[in-house]
Design a protein with these regions (language model features):
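Helix-to-loop junction immediately C-terminal to a conserved catalytic motif
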Residues: 57
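Conserved ABC ATPase signature
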Residues: 149-153, 157
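ABC ATPase NBD coupling module
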Residues: 19-20, 74-92, 110, 118, ...
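Hydrophobic anchor residue at the start of the ABC signature
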Residues: 163
Length: 166
C-alpha cells in the first residue's frame, strides 16, 4: 500500500498584478508527505510558504503542476467535485499565524477536542479533557493551559495548541 497522502508535483503559482506585470510565487516545487509524517515548510518571508498551503487547501488554483491528496488529483476540478466530501474532511494545516485559526471564544480544552468531537474520534483516555491534557503535555505545555483562551497565550503557545489539536 502506498503511504503517500500528499504529493505536490512541479507546482507553480503566479500572481497577476496588472495586465503586464506578474509575480512568480512558486516555480516547479515538488514534495511528498507520507501517512503519519509531520511535515514543515520553512523559508524566509515571501518565499511562498503560505501560497503552497493555500494551493494545497484549494484556496488558490495553481498555474502549473499537480497536487495529489490520497490518490486524487485535486488540481483537476472534476476530481475535486467527485471526491469533495473526502477532500473536505481529511486535511489539517497549521499556519504560522496560529492565533487566527482558533476560535477565540473557546477554551484551549475545546480547541483541542473539537476535531475529535466533530469526527467522532475515540481515544484511549477516558474523557476529552484527559485527552487534551495528554496532547498538551506532548507539545510541552501542562494542563494549566486547558482553561485559558487563545488570546491569553503567547504566539508560541498558540502554535503548540494548534499542533496538539492536529
Amino acid at each position: 500500500m502506498d503511504d503517500v497522502v500528499l504529493e505536490v508535483r512541479h507546482l507553480s503559482h503566479r500572481f497577476k498584478l496588472t495586465r503586464k506585470l506578474a509575480v512568480q510565487a512558486l516555480d516547479d516545487l515538488s514534495f511528498q508527505v507520507r501517512r503519519g509524517e509531520i511535515f514543515g515548510l520553512v523559508g524566509e518571508s515571501g518565499s511562498g510558504k503560505s501560497t503552497v498551503a493555500r494551493c494545497v487547501m484549494n484556496l488558490y488554483q495553481p498555474t502549473g503542476g499537480e497536487i495529489w491528496f490520497n490518490g486524487v488529483n485535486i488540481t483537476d476540478r472534476s476530481q475535486r467535485r467527485k471526491h469533495k466530501k473526502m477532500l473536505e474532511t481529511k486535511r489539517q494545516l497549521i499556519f504560522q499565524d496560529s492565533g487566527s485559526s482558533m476560535n477565540q471564544r473557546m477554551k484551549v480544552v475545546d480547541v483541542i477536542t473539537e476535531p475529535m468531537r466533530i469526527h467522532h474520534i475515540q481515544t484511549p483516555r477516558k474523557t476529552p479533557r484527559e485527552e487534551a491534557a495528554f496532547q498538551l503535555k506532548y507539545v510541552g505545555l501542562d494542563g494549566s493551559y486547558l482553561d485559558q483562551y487563545p488570546a491569553e497565550l503567547s504566539g508560541g503557545q498558540r502554535q503548540r495548541v494548534n499542533i496538539a489539536r492536529a
